[in-house]
Amino acid sequence: MAISAGLLSLSVRFPKNVRTNDFWREHYPDVVKDAEQRTLARLWAKPTGDVAQAEADLFTAAMVPYVDDPFRGTKQRRVLADGESVLDLELDAAREALAKAGLAAGDVDLLIAASFLPANVGVGNAPYLAQALGLRGAAWNLETACSSSLVALETAAAFVEARRHRHVLVVVSCTYSRVAPLDDTMSWFLGDGAAAFVVGPVQAGRGVLGFHTIHTGDTCGTFFYDLAVDEKTAQPKIVMGATAKTGKALAQNAQPNLTACAQGAAKQAGVSMNDISLFVFNTPTAWYADFGAKALGVDPSRTVSTYERYANIGPVLMPANLHHAASTHRLRDDDLVLLYSVGSVSSASAAIVRWQSVGLGDAPPD
């Protein structure tokens, strides 16, 4: 008899430190003054040339209302405080996810960690988490940039369906503030956060119904990581950057990636877009939910976005949006939900899930 797999619990955690746009206005006024000549404005540039062509590009058209704002629609972001670790956030989320699923450490067969980026260079967080949680099963790392949480869900569900593992704990984090210099305007749309969820057997016909995942190799040569010398400590550090072609490449591939994944997952699940109650995209920009709705031909009211609260939190976006939808009562049992995430130089993925009540962690404070 086939086993259905789905979420048993979902938890999110964010740093207490909230950084608003006034931080840069106060501490980096020259950067704000010259914002249109800096990274973020080059990344999300004002359209030039053929107006009709710009309007036909749904991603660019959705961006237009935000291009006169130097922060491109970002209002605030959560960032790690001095002495606060990504492992702290991950462990808090993981412990709550286990508690809400009614499980003890010994009930977990596998832990999958998707830390973007991990606490230590070259070594992922999975064994550190497993040790701290007292797990005795398998623990490994998975990374496919901003799609890590959804691909981890796909991986975990496959193991449960195959009866290889019964309970899989997935822990996801993003700490962009560690690699985004404050004098680089790209830091304006980046934040930190963590999430955790347990995947296990669910009632037949519920949980994950279909998946479709593709690579995003067409975005190779866009975002990158490099080494730089910290001016304060004179020590090497990792910094995030973007090439000149990044914005154009992301805009060109946004719609093809979304439609391919969404249609592929819907086909596997045997449903149509009209059957879906809520579309939970990862939302790395202020306009992404509107873009996604237009690309799939659905009403924007059927989408959810926490970008205004958290900015771009990479692989944590999808679980954060899903948690927000559930905690604000936008999901009911048996609702069909489309989950979608896209990462640069990594993967794009979509899932169709038939919702059931899950052990939901506490809503983050405002």
Q: Where on the chain are the PLM-derived regions?
A:
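Condensing-enzyme catalytic core mediating Claisen C-C bond formation in acyl metabolism
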Residues: 1-83, 184-252, 256, 260, ...
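Acidic-glycine-rich active-site phosphate/pyrophosphate-binding loop
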Residues: 62-68, 117-134, 170-175, 229-234, ...
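Metal-dependent C-N hydrolase catalytic cores
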Residues: 48-119, 125-126
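Short acidic, glycine/serine/threonine-rich loops at helix termini
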Residues: 18-19, 122-125, 153-154, 179-184, ...
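Phosphate/pyrophosphate-binding loops at sites that engage ATP/ADP/AMP, CoA/4′-phosphopantetheine
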Residues: 66-70, 93-109, 260-277, 325-330
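Flexible, glycine-rich active-site loops centered on histidine and acidic residues
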Residues: 163-194
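Claisen-condensing/thiolase-fold acyl-transfer catalytic domains that form or cleave C-C bonds
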Residues: 91-94, 117-119, 128-131, 136-162, ...
